[in-house]
């Protein structure tokens, strides 16, 4: 199975459009805040990490233990990597480090920052406020990535924060067409329409499950091909006439 590919499924196309809407927005009229959300297993994190790598975006991932300080440290490290600079200044107060981040962001208005697992910030008003300050005070784009209820949670927690989001996309279950395209681009073996239909049905459109099934299918096909080739080689050896020594 080929690794690291970002296949142009429906979700990828729509998520790209959601980001491009912010890239082309009137910057003085709209802040660059967007939200990608959806059920588990639909490829949100895969999309976020791979599009960040392809387009040189800053990718940050929150954790259950994330704090405003750990976020600012992660942010300044990501910004320095984006600028190809070494040794980010990791000393000072949270506010001092964040101020350095803002200085660099203000100097590079085209920067795009993806914050994955935003759900972990919903119980931390200060952390949410830190992210809001980025889009309120700079022309940078910040894409939040969260679970299926992230949009509703954000609206409940802070109506004014929610109003700042100018682009949304909810990831949907993978279609048969999506899984067919993925199989065609990432598998190193040929498959039948019946096999792909079966994977789509049994995965229920969950991309994570579908990828596991595709991997198992590829492994099985390769094993069968290897067994067949070995048997054919043995048959060929048996049929090859032995030459008498001169």
Where are these regions (language model features)?
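Sensor-1/coupling segment of RecA-like P-loop NTPase cores
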Residues: 34-40, 120, 134-158
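C-terminal alpha-helical "lid" subdomain
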Residues: 1-17, 31-32, 41, 45-49, ...
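A short helix-turn-beta junction within AAA+ P-loop NTPase domains corresponding to the substrate/partner-engaging
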Residues: 57, 156-173
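A structured, charge-rich N-terminal accessory region that forms the first stable segment of a protein
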Residues: 16-17, 21-26
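Mid-core helix/loop region of P-loop NTP-binding domains shared across ATPases and GTPases
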Residues: 73, 84-141, 174-182, 194-212, ...
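Pre-Walker A (Motif I) flank of P-loop NTPase domains
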Residues: 27-34, 56
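Conserved NTP-binding/hydrolysis module of P-loop NTPases
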Residues: 56, 69-88
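Conserved catalytic segments around the Walker B and adjacent sensor/switch elements
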Residues: 52-65
């Amino acid at each position: 199975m080929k690794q690291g590919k970002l296949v142009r499924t429906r979700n990828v196309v729509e998520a790209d459009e959601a980001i491009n809407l912010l890239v082309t927005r009137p910057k003085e009229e709209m802040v660059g805040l967007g939200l990608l959300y959806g059920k588990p297993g639909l490829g949100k994190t895969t999309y976020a990490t791979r599009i960040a790598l392809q387009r040189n975006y800053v990718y940050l991932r929150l954790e259950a233990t994330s704090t405003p300080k750990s976020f600012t440290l992660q942010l300044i490290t990501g910004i320095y990597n984006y600028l190809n600079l070494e040794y980010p200044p990791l000393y000072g107060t949270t506010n001092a480090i964040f101020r350095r981040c803002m200085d660099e962001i203000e100097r590079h208005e085209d920067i795009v920052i993806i914050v994955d697992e935003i759900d972990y910030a919903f119980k931390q008003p200060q952390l949410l406020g830190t992210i809001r300050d980025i889009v309120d005070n700079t022309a940078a784009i910040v894409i939040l990535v969260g679970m299926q209820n992230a949009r509703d949670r954000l609206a409940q927690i802070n109506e004014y924060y929610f109003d700042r989001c100018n682009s949304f996309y909810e990831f949907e279950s993978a279609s048969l067409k999506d899984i067919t395209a993925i199989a065609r681009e990432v598998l190193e073996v040929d498959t039948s329409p019946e096999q792909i239909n079966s994977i789509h049905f049994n995965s229920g459109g969950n991309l994570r499950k579908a990828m596991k099934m595709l991997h198992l299918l590829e492994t099985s096909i390769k094993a069968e091909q290897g067994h067949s080739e070995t048997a054919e080689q043995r048959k060929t050896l048996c049929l090859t006439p032995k030459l008498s020594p001169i």
